[in-house]
């Protein structure tokens, strides 16, 4: 094995040469170890030969009794020659229920082939399939010709068929139809003969020994007791991959070989993966059905956000800043309108824009309650062309200026049913008393452009 001219090392540490078969000495050792009862996996580890190579050599030895490698390169010689195919057809005609391995034994017994030229069972089955397909094709053609002959001899009354110059029977020249013979039922002895599928006893002792060895190495399925299954399941709950010490301890406890325990854990892990996949599929299906029914699964963020924030336009989130008709004064709130973008150069009052009359000594008459009136509705436009409300009138019915805003009467201010009017000087003094005359003039123009008036 330690050839200096090797071209690689396999997964077991053994060297090999590409294009060269395994040495005959190694092949003989593989067969000897198999006769002693070693498993192919143990032979592979012991001789540092790949498992596939060991299995292939043993399979060829069981079938043909030889350990010599076949020819490398080129195509294999054709073993299903015409003589062999004719002999297979004769066997099948004489005994229609014959098996392929029986045909193979007959070819060897009749000295049609030897161990080197005998076709395999798959080759014989392929020949039988080809013969059956050819026979079916011939049968279909015969049935077609019989139908044509019957139609041609049918007495038609039509003048077109009577004018046909050449009769079909003379043109085709078919033989008269012969019915197929009836199939006689088989006797009891014939049934027993067909059901006997055991191969005949081979004359060679080495062939019989090979078959016995092959049956001995093919073990049956291991059956576990309830105590063994409980111990294995308990260990599987502890870990899916037990180490060698855990396997040895478990083997001594439940009286099973370590190799069987290792195989059981491998199969149990595969079963657990299948069950896990089914559980994930069922959970995803439940989630999809809940989403289709309109009941999404709540998340902590969504619950917290829904409890903390409300939409701006909802009645529950907006306090009622207008009292009922039986109250005479306007209540005060700490609401600050978002007017910093519109009036960036002005200081913002920390008061409600509709409650500054009370801060300056104003009083209003009772007015009807407005339920859907929000301050942000009045600041949606930056220019008078964007603003949805009409511009401020220029007559004296609008804003009435007064030099003494603290003593304004209620009769000077119309109620909200016809519009709200407040003195401009009171508005300016309430915003910032330290403004100059020019700034107050600009603010007065701005107030005329955007006055606060609900319709």
Swiss-Prot record:
Protein name from the UniProt record: Paired box protein 6 homolog
Main location class: nucleus
Region listing for RED subdomain, in residue ranges: 83-131
GO MF term set: DNA-binding transcription factor activity; DNA-binding transcription factor activity, RNA polymerase II-specific; RNA polymerase II cis-regulatory region sequence-specific DNA binding
Consequence of gene loss (knockout): RNAi-mediated knockdown causes defects in gonadal distal tip cell migration. RNAi-mediated knockdown reduces expression of the integrin alpha pat-2 in gonadal DTCs in about 70% of individuals and in 90% on a vab-3 mutant background. RNAi-mediated knockdown increases expression of the integrin alpha ina-1 in gonadal DTCs in hermaphrodites. RNAi-mediated knockdown induces generation of additional dopaminergic neurons. BAG sensory neuron-specific RNAi-mediated knockdown reduces expression of receptor-type guanylyl cyclase gcy-9.
Region (PAI subdomain): 8-64
Keyword terms of this UniProt record: Cytoplasm, Developmental protein, DNA-binding, Homeobox, Nucleus, Paired box, Transcription, Transcription regulation
GO biological process terms on file: anterior/posterior pattern specification; brain development; cell fate commitment; negative regulation of distal tip cell migration; nematode male tail mating organ morphogenesis; nematode male tail tip morphogenesis; positive regulation of glial cell differentiation; positive regulation of transcription by RNA polymerase II
Family: Belongs to the paired homeobox family.
Ranges of compositional bias, category Low complexity: 289-306
Summary of the tissues where the protein is detected: Expressed widely in head epidermal cells and neurons, including BAG sensory neurons.
Gene designation per UniProt: vab-3
Recorded consequence of changing residue 120 to N: In ns157; defects in AWC, AFD and ADF axon guidance. Shorter CEP dendrites. Almost abolishes expression of hlh-17 and ptr-10 in dorsal CEPsh glia, whereas nearly half of animals express both these genes in ventral CEPsh glia
Consequence when changing residue 52 to E: In mw105; defects in gonadal distal tip cell migration in larval development. About 50% of individuals have reduced expression of the integrin alpha pat-2. Hermaphrodites express integrin alpha ina-1 abnormally, beyond the egg-laying stage
Subcellular location: Nucleus
Function: Transcription factor that binds a motif with the core sequence 5'-GCGTA-3' in the promoter of various genes. During development, required for cell fate specification probably by promoting or repressing expression of genes involved in specific cell fate. Involved in head epidermal morphogenesis. Involved in gonadal distal tip cell (DTC) migration, during which modulates expression of the integrin alpha genes, pat-2 and ina-1. Regulates ventral and dorsal cephalic sheath (CEPsh) glia differentiation and expression of transcription factor hlh-17 in CEPsh glia.
Region (Disordered): 274-329
Gene3D superfamilies, per the entry: Homeodomain-like, Winged helix-like DNA-binding domain superfamily/Winged helix DNA-binding domain
Coiled coil segments of this chain: none
One annotated Gene Ontology cellular component of this protein: nucleus
Biased composition (Polar residues): 307-329
DNA-binding region range list: 5-131, 217-276
């Amino acid at each position: 094995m330690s050839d200096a001219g090797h071209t690689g090392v396999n997964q077991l540490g053994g060297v090999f040469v590409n294009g060269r078969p395994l040495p005959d000495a190694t092949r003989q050792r593989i067969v000897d170890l198999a006769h002693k009862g070693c498993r192919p996996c143990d032979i592979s580890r012991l001789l540092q030969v790949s498992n596939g190579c060991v299995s292939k050599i043993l399979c060829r030895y069981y079938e043909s009794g030889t350990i010599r490698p076949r020819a490398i390169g080129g195509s294999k010689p054709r073993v299903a020659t015409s003589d062999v195919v004719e002999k297979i057809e004769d066997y099948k005609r004489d005994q229609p229920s014959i098996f392929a391995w029986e045909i193979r034994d007959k070819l060897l017994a009749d000295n049609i082939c030897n161990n080197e030229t005998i076709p395999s069972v798959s080759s014989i089955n392929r020949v039988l399939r080809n013969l059956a397909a050819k026979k079916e094709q011939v049968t279909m053609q015969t049935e077609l010709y019989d139908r044509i002959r019957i139609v041609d001899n049918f007495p038609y009354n039509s003048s077109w068929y009577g004018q046909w110059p050449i009769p079909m029977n003379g043109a085709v020249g078919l033989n008269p139809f012969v019915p197929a013979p009836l199939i006689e039922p088989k006797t009891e002895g014939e049934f027993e003969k067909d059901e006997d599928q055991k191969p005949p006893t081979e004359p060679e002792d080495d062939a019989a020994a090979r078959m016995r060895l092959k049956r001995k190495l093919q073990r049956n399925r291991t059956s576990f007791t309830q105590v063994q299954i409980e111990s294995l399941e308990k260990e599987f709950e502890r870990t899916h991959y037990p180490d060698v010490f855990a396997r040895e301890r478990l083997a001594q406890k439940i009286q099973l070989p370590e190799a069987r325990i290792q195989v059981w854990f491998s199969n149990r892990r595969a079963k657990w993966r299948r069950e896990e996949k089914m559980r994930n599929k069922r959970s995803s299906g439940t989630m999809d059905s809940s989403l289709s029914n309109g009941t999404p699964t709540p998340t902590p963020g969504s619950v917290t956000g829904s409890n903390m924030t409300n939409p701006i336009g909802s009645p529950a989130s907006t306090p009622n800043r207008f009292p009922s008709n039986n109250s005479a004064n306007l209540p005060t709130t700490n609401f600050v309108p978002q007017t910093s973008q519109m009036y960036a150069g002005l200081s913002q009052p920390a008061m409600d824009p509709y409650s500054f009359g009370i801060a300056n000594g104003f009083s209003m008459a009772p007015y009807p309650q407005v339920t859907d009136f929000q301050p942000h509705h009045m600041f949606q436009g930056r220019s008078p062309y964007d603003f949805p409300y009409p511009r401020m009138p220029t007559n004296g019915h609008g804003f009435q200026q007064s030099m003494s805003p603290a003593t304004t009467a209620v009769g000077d201010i119309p109620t909200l049913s016809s519009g709200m009017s407040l003195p401009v000087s009171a508005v300016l003094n309430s915003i910032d008393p330290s403004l100059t005359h020019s700034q107050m003039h600009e603010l007065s123009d701005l107030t005329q452009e955007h006055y606060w008036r609900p319709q």
